[in-house]
Amino acid sequence: MENKNFETGEKKKRSSITAENVAFVRALESCKPEGESICYDPYASRFLSQQYLMFMELAARDPSRIPFPGVHNSLSARVRYFDDFVKRSIDEGLEQLVILGAGYDTRAYRIEGLKDKVRVFEIDHPETQSVKMGKIKDIFGSLPDHVEYVSVDFETEDFGQRLLEHGYGRSRKTVFIMEGLIYYLPPKAVDEMLAFIAKNSGTGSAIIFDYVHESSIDRTDGICGVQCTACDQQAIKSAASDMAQQGEPYKFGIKEGMIEAFITKRGFSRVCNVTSEDYKKAYFRGINEKRPVCCLSYFVHAMVE
């Protein structure tokens, strides 16, 4: 639900659009003082165009300028929840981290413990990877040794084969992150991705991803009901057509109430489904208590059987 593209002028490459939208959310949230920011990413702003940076400065001074605040807050919570999951996994002996649809993800560079202990594989479209690698070189002077950049078109290429070619170890304890990814993939691609993970991961491996219900994609009105703000209803209502015009249409959702059955059928167990109420309670307390979240956004993690 990467909701708005502020870029004008020359049309950007399709995969980079979503990547920059999410980097904008992380960068804007990181402008808040400690104790108020839901997530923190010191590198996110380095991936933003001048127009995004200008808007970020305006929105940081005047939060009322933030478009679709519920969606923004849910995306910030997603970053935080996934960060926390990775940190716990490091403490529990993580050996590999695979980030599918990595975009401008910066976990490999900002989460303590990954550089020294964990091999990271960042997988995304070749166009996005090219931009990403250039930015990383600008920030750090060179590409880090602990990260492998794997270029894949998920709809036309075998990501598993490409991953193996880059040194992925089938027997190692691995976490697979699919953040802001699966609703852009056709069902067949999602099934193939999960099948590879289930069959090619070491003991204790896990997946974590976010998803929306099928109804959120298929319906054209009344999507959010009364739980989301009016502006967020409009954001989700128009998101599919907006992203389709930019080359990234929504294609996949999971039937309501069926997430555990969906996951276990594909070779996973110990399913934990996280609702907007759950992450609102976990992260939006004190000064953040009145910040709205979007009720359509769900997170889920599970263990490989």
Predicted regions and their residues:
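Rossmann-like AdoMet
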Residues: 1-98, 104-150, 158
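Rossmann-like AdoMet/SAM-dependent catalytic core
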Residues: 2-5, 44, 216-305
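Glycine-rich phosphate-binding loop signature in dinucleotide/nucleotide-binding domains
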Residues: 89-93, 166-172, 201
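ATP-dependent adenylate-handling active sites, centered on carboxylate activation for C-N bond formation
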Residues: 111-114, 158-161, 171-173, 189-193, ...
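A short, conserved alpha-helix within the catalytic core of class I
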Residues: 147-149, 158-161, 184-202
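Short loop/turn elements that flank and shape the SAM/SAH-binding pocket of Class I
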Residues: 155-158, 166
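A short SAM/SAH-binding and catalytic strip from SAM-dependent methyltransferases
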Residues: 163-189
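Conserved beta-strand signature within the Rossmann-like core of class I S-adenosyl-L-methionine
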Residues: 175, 194, 199-216
